[in-house]
Curated annotation (Swiss-Prot):
One of its GO terms (cellular component) is oligosaccharyltransferase complex. PANTHER family: KERATINOCYTE-ASSOCIATED PROTEIN 2. Its main location: membrane. Subunit of the oligosaccharyl transferase (OST) complex that catalyzes the initial transfer of a defined glycan (Glc(3)Man(9)GlcNAc(2) in eukaryotes) from the lipid carrier dolichol-pyrophosphate to an asparagine residue within an Asn-X-Ser/Thr consensus motif in nascent polypeptide chains, the first step in protein N-glycosylation. N-glycosylation occurs cotranslationally and the complex associates with the Sec61 complex at the channel-forming translocon complex that mediates protein translocation across the endoplasmic reticulum (ER). All subunits are required for a maximal enzyme activity. Keywords: Membrane, Transmembrane, Transmembrane helix. Belongs to the KRTCAP2 family. It comes from Drosophila melanogaster. The lineage of its organism: Eukaryota, Metazoa, Ecdysozoa, Arthropoda, Hexapoda. Component of the oligosaccharyltransferase (OST) complex. It is a multi-pass membrane protein. The chain crosses the membrane at residues 11-31, 42-62, 74-94, 97-117. This is Protein KRTCAP2 homolog.
Length: 141
């Protein structure tokens, strides 16, 4: 019962984050002239595009968890690079500086997401101490 509930919540989370990223991109693209008016608005656009990155990464990661199982994790090369390049291309349609600042804000957001997920979902592996005695052979000083 709990596996199906977890799977349903993962599907719902994937759909909601995908829809929010599309709506946020559409809003940012529709208001691109407003973001080009001042430097502060361009920085705000980069910050909002970092949310597009986080939402699209959540959508992709949750969709992969549905397909490949609950223990599947997003890796750097396929998922994160794909979502980041997609976000940078979308931010470049609004303003070039939006693309640059979205990369910086996205990396900061990814760092904090990694810290939060490590805190809550990491499994502690007990360390194994190496034996201190040697069997035969030369002894080094």
């Amino acid at each position: 019962m709990s596996a199906s509930v977890s799977s349903k919540s993962t599907v719902v989370s994937s759909i909601i984050s995908g829809l929010l990223s599309i709506v946020l991109f559409g809003t940012l693209r529709f208001c691109s002239e407003w973001f080009n008016d001042s430097q502060l608005r361009v920085l705000l656009g980069g910050y909002l595009f970092s949310w597009v990155f986080i939402l699209s990464l959540t959508c992709v990661s949750n969709a992969e968890m549905v397909v490949f199982g609950q223990d599947f994790q997003a890796k750097l090369l396929p998922e994160i690079i794909f979502c980041l390049s997609l976000t940078v291309a979308a931010a470049g349609l609004v303003h070039r500086v939006c693309a640059t600042t979205s990369v910086l804000f996205s990396l900061v957001g990814l760092y904090f997401l990694n810290r939060i997920s490590t805190k809550y979902y990491s499994v502690q592996v007990p360390s194994v101490d190496a034996p201190t005695t040697r069997k035969g052979g030369k002894k080094f000083k």
